Amino acid sequence: MVGSRTSPIFNALRVELNAREAELVEIPLIQPADPFLDMAGEDLRRRIFLTENENGDSLCLRPEFTIPVCRNHIALNAATPKRYAYLGEVFRQRRDGAAEFLQAGIEDLGAADEAASDARSLADALSCVKAIAPDAPLEIVLGDQSVFAGMLKALGLPQGWRKKLLRSFGDAHSMDLALAELTGTQRRDPLPESLAVLVAEGDEIGLARMLEAEMLEAGISPGAGRTPVEIARRLIEKEDLAATHFPAAALDLLRQFLAIRVSLDTAAVTLRAFAADNALDLGAVLQKFEARADAIAQAGIEMKDIIYDASFGRPLDYYTGLVYEIRDASNRQDGVLAGGGRYDRLLTMLGACEAIPGVGFSIWLDRLQALAGEKQ
């Protein structure tokens, strides 16, 4: 494993986390797989190490910390606001590099001031990285899924298409395919007739049964990856979406929006000008955007050193607002040192009885170790 629990970086990060008013929690290595398969996003789903217990329940090696930390909070029925820190191994299938590596981070749950807690998350992540690599050239990229969602609403897109495009947010290839589909320029492979009839009728239950039977016949476990019900729902949704096309002028505006990439100190002005020039109602989301930018400045972070990229998202489905990454500016290929964002619906999806907002970040210790030049 790259990055050892006995390394100076591990111990230094423990000190940093302890200094940030967060309770250090221990999370079991073996986790129920369904929450990750349902909520973590396609990219992470493909990388999970899956297994089953003797009862046939799907389990996995812990692929990340946010979901299990939130589940632990719900199980304890803990009061909020509450800050949790973690430091330990995660397991992901990767083409290059070790499948087991260390992550550290903080999850901030239930804070009432969204702008202040967003800014604190970014400031904490940046401080932890700089504590280990104080002289490293860093690049900070920030996006906002809620601004993108506001843009889709302002353009008048149907709800189904908004959901599809939000799932593609941050993935340039997926977004290009979705936009091509929306314009009717993307050819779709036809389904087998037996499936196509059920899709056309919107028969989700019948379709799921047929898919499950075909998976079992092919020797594929229905619990591995997407479930038959989820696949059926997606196929029916795709059929509904295929019947909707959108004016080229509106799609051109969406592409112009996604091309916005400016420093954070000019981002709000740029977005307001874009909205005004194109008669788009983005007032509510931009007020939140500006409040967060002000809070980031008050946290002592230079806004001119942060890039706002309107197309930037992170490959996890549970984010709802702020997303950010801190990168090694000298390594464009694999230079993400820390990443985080806001996930205000996640705890409700995991079973919390009331809405609990959340924001957090994770640090990759192996990459930080390589950047800091630590000797083994």
Curated annotation (Swiss-Prot):
Keywords: Amino-acid biosynthesis, Cytoplasm, Histidine biosynthesis. Pathway: Amino-acid biosynthesis; L-histidine biosynthesis; L-histidine from 5-phospho-alpha-D-ribose 1-diphosphate: step 1/9. One of its GO terms (cellular component) is cytoplasm. It is found in: Cytoplasm. Its main location: cytoplasm. Heteromultimer composed of HisG and HisZ subunits. NCBIfam families: PRK12295.1-1, PRK12295.1-4. This function is generally fulfilled by the C-terminal part of HisG, which is missing in some bacteria such as this one. This is ATP phosphoribosyltransferase regulatory subunit. It comes from Brucella canis (strain ATCC 23365 / NCTC 10854 / RM-666).
